[in-house]
Amino acid sequence: MNEEKAVVVFSGGQDSTTCLFWAKKQFGEVEAVTFDYGQRHRREIDVAQAIADELGVRHTVLDLSLLGQLAPNALTRRDIAIEQKKGELPTTFVDGRNLLFLSFAAVFAKQRGARHIVTGVCETDFSGYPDCRDVFIKSLNVTLNLAMDYEFVIHTPLMWLTKAETWKLADELGALEFIRTKTLTCYNGIIADGCGECPACALRKRGLDEYLREKAEVESR
């Protein structure tokens, strides 16, 4: 285990909760930071706080409500439908979200004496979001180091994992049932298996079904 301190960018969803469990295995001290960016489902923040409390992780919520003013999107405005037109990004994409989240997380981490930042971005199942790409994360890592003259390391443990592989990692961390029943991924604000209809729920369910099927096949041999 690395005895250094890490900050996890934390939403209370499947991916960031998996990253929180991962970070607790990897680092001597872990904190979680959640951003209030005007998301229409405020329950996300409550879920993040509840999970952090249960895991004994210090949790901070930072106000980034200006993001909803700058970049209208389906995650902050109920009058914008969750959809994806051919050749376009989904309406759930928030311009600059990960750029701002990671930049503010870096400032927060430096003030806490932490070099390590953990985020659940993933290029394998990223819905075309440009700020989930590995090249962006590597570029931002260099920029943050130059901007603050500080040796940050941004960790992306899910970057090259499919959703099924993310569930496998959760299982290996001993957290599958916890993540399955206590996290909030659903765009409609429903904990655990969610609404079953939005893109986030569909991706989550497809990955879980695939992993459980593969696990059952291995165990039956």
From Swiss-Prot:
Enzyme Commission identifier(s): 6.3.4.20
Cofactor details (free text): Binds 1 zinc ion per subunit.
Catalytic activity: 7-carboxy-7-deazaguanine + NH4(+) + ATP = 7-cyano-7-deazaguanine + ADP + phosphate + H2O + H(+)
Binding site for ATP: 10-20
Segments forming a coiled coil: none
Record's keyword annotation contains Metal-binding: yes
Keywords attached to this entry: ATP-binding, Ligase, Metal-binding, Nucleotide-binding, Queuosine biosynthesis, Zinc
Residues holding Zn(2+): 186, 195, 198, 201
GO BP term (any one): queuosine biosynthetic process
Cofactor(s) needed for function: Zn(2+)
Record family assignment: Belongs to the QueC family.
Function: Catalyzes the ATP-dependent conversion of 7-carboxy-7-deazaguanine (CDG) to 7-cyano-7-deazaguanine (preQ(0)).
Subunit structure as annotated in this protein's UniProt entry: Homodimer.
Official protein name in the record: 7-cyano-7-deazaguanine synthase
Organism of origin: Geobacillus kaustophilus (strain HTA426)
Gene field: queC
